[in-house]
């Protein structure tokens, strides 16, 4: 079993370019736990999947980053991908 970071990376790698763009947009609207700050939208725009994964883990730590990715995927109605990440993480 891999790390949560690897699980996040694998799920994000399966998104189409349009889905990834939507994911980044929705990441800016998902409610955050107290004590965490949003990653500025401008900082997300040019990130590739590996850099986005690194930014998520650096900003929110692995556990919470995985929870956020699941929340965004659910908001996008990508329930299969969200469930896959939950099982892997």
Swiss-Prot record:
Free-text description of this protein's post-translational modifications in UniProt: Phosphorylated.
Phosphoprotein keyword on record: yes
Domain Pyrin: residue ranges: 1-89
GO biological process, one term: positive regulation of interleukin-1 beta production
Signal peptide coordinates: none
Pfam families, A to Z: PYRIN
SUPFAM superfamilies: DEATH domain
Key words of the record: Cytoplasm, Phosphoprotein, Signal transduction inhibitor
Record note on quaternary structure: Interacts with PYCARD/ASC (via pyrin domain).
The protein's name in its UniProt record: Pyrin domain-containing protein 1
Organism: Homo sapiens
Gene it is expressed from: PYDC1
């Amino acid at each position: 079993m891999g790390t949560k970071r690897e699980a996040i990376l694998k799920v994000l790698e399966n998104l189409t370019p349009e889905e990834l763009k939507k994911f980044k947009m929705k990441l800016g609207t998902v409610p955050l736990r107290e004590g965490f700050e949003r990653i500025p939208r401008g900082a997300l725009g040019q990130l590739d999947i590996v850099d986005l994964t690194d930014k998520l883990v650096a900003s929110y730590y692995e556990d919470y980053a995985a929870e956020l990715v699941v929340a965004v995927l659910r908001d996008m109605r990508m329930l299969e991908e969200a469930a896959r990440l939950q099982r892997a993480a």
